[in-house]
Amino acid sequence: MNKQQLKAYFMLMRLHRPIPILLILWPTLTALVLASHGLPDISYLVIFTIGVVVMRTVGCIINDIADVDFDKHVARTNTRPLTSGQLSIKNAIWLCISLTLVAFICVLFLNLYTILLSFVALFLAILYPFCKRFFAIPQLILGLAFNFGIFMAFSTIQNQIPVEAWIFYIATICWTIAYDTIYALADREFDLEIGIKSSAVLFGNKVFRYILLFNFLSLLLLIILGIYCDFNSFFYLGVVICSLFFVRNYFLYKKLGITNCINAFSANHWIGLIIFIIAVIQYI
């Protein structure tokens, strides 16, 4: 394997773009903190971090395999390794299988409940790339998939999925729909041309209102989570800071353009970090 092929595999796994990994990792780590009522065992932090990174790459590979013919028509994606012919579909499938096995080995260190949930997580990861063909809001499926680690974190620590896990899960789904709609704005013109469905297409000229709506719902659910868990004022201060980030992002993505939308999308990882920090503060 030469240097060019290694670079192609690196690009296929999106390791050069770590922001989506952080968008998955922060809610997962936050869930571990919430479930543990403090800092969790280091082994869980390691297992879940590896799991997030590996399953994110698996999702990217499945996505590129599913979209190989569509990506040729989109300026942002027509140079991807599979679309450009740097790697074959066969190469991608073998890498996907190998990484899935790595993720499954990690899960084997956890309890039976979490092992069973991992199959649901895999199903969602496979489903998302294909639902863009028939489901009007694929961002909802992405939200279910990206944040499923929340359930797995609670099942690992508590062997159950309590009410607070559901509240946090739904909050992060709303957040995901919002930030991935921003991301989809970058490709909306191309998606309309080739018939790909997205929330950015569905919401049309009201898209900015819907993004703000889902941001508001995520904040509201975080407040409900804070009340349910009897969190202190630092938690609500963090929620206020998150709302300021949402406002800042609004003025960025409202300008449209690929760069503005991608930058607004990427800034959401700071929101995930803030939520993680204020969750940790609750148990110090």
Swiss-Prot record:
Domain of life: Bacteria
Transmembrane segments: 19-39, 42-62, 85-105, 107-127, 134-154, 165-185, 211-231, 233-253, 261-281
The entry's keywords: Cell inner membrane, Cell membrane, Magnesium, Membrane, Transferase, Transmembrane, Transmembrane helix, Ubiquinone biosynthesis
Gene from which this protein is expressed: ubiA
Catalytic EC class: transferase
Protein family membership: Belongs to the UbiA prenyltransferase family.
Record GO biological process: ubiquinone biosynthetic process
Membrane protein topology class: Multi-pass membrane protein
Species of the source: Francisella tularensis subsp. tularensis (strain SCHU S4 / Schu 4)
Pathway: Cofactor biosynthesis; ubiquinone biosynthesis
Compartmental location: Cell inner membrane
Major location (coarse): membrane
Gene3D superfamilies: UbiA prenyltransferase (1.20.120.1780)
GO molecular function list: 4-hydroxybenzoate polyprenyltransferase activity
InterPro entries: HB_polyprenyltransferase-like, Prenyltransferase, UbiA_prenyltransferase, UbiA_prenylTrfase_CS, UbiA_sf
Cofactor: Mg(2+)
UniProt function note: Catalyzes the prenylation of para-hydroxybenzoate (PHB) with an all-trans polyprenyl group. Mediates the second step in the final reaction sequence of ubiquinone-8 (UQ-8) biosynthesis, which is the condensation of the polyisoprenoid side chain with PHB, generating the first membrane-bound Q intermediate 3-octaprenyl-4-hydroxybenzoate.
Annotated S-S bridges: none
Designated name of the protein: 4-hydroxybenzoate octaprenyltransferase
GO cellular component terms listed in the entry, alphabetical order: plasma membrane
Presence of keyword rRNA-binding: no
PANTHER family: 4-HYDROXYBENZOATE POLYPRENYLTRANSFERASE, MITOCHONDRIAL, PRENYLTRANSFERASES
Reactions listed under catalytic activity: all-trans-octaprenyl diphosphate + 4-hydroxybenzoate = 4-hydroxy-3-(all-trans-octaprenyl)benzoate + diphosphate
Enzyme Commission numbers on file: 2.5.1.39
